[in-house]
Amino acid sequence: MHSQMSGLPPSPPVGTKEDPAKAVDGLLSLTEFQVVGAAKAMPADKYSFAPAQGIFAASQTTQFDTVRTFVAQVTHVAQANYFFFGWSGIQPDRDVKAIGSITTKDEAVAALEASFVYAHKAIATITPENAFVAIKPIDGFSTRTTIAAFAAAHGYDHYGQMVEYLRMNGIVPPASAK
């Protein structure tokens, strides 16, 4: 577990009142460390990989026609970061919709990394005064802090799927290799 947590900064002393932006940013940084690491670990020629019936036993019948490719997992997280942190009012530095059309590893990783830069900028606008003030809800969450925490959780959901894709291709995820 320690190797998977190595993306976090050191914890403050017990009893210290922590700045909400710093606390949430640490959570997002850990998600970023894992997701970007997985995205970089998958070889470029495997970015079009998606699980299909042929890799499972005949008795394990499932519909795979809507399963995302690896590149779609990466670009989905990138687009979601822009969506979740749009409350900040910070204008994205790219066409967010176009991210969904990316098909190459280099472009997907660049978009993913840029989306985390955007997310960190948004989190930096969270203050003790506005952290838990209700704003326009996103997926049922209505404060800057809860939306930011949900964004990190969402990234972890897709990280778990990306790990499965890596393992199906014989690749040990970077966090597990340490």
Regions found by a protein language model. Give the residues of each.
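Catalytic His-Asp segment of secreted/periplasmic serine-dependent ester chemistry enzymes
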Residues: 44, 125, 141
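Short, contiguous alpha-helical
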Residues: 25, 33-36, 49-97, 136-178
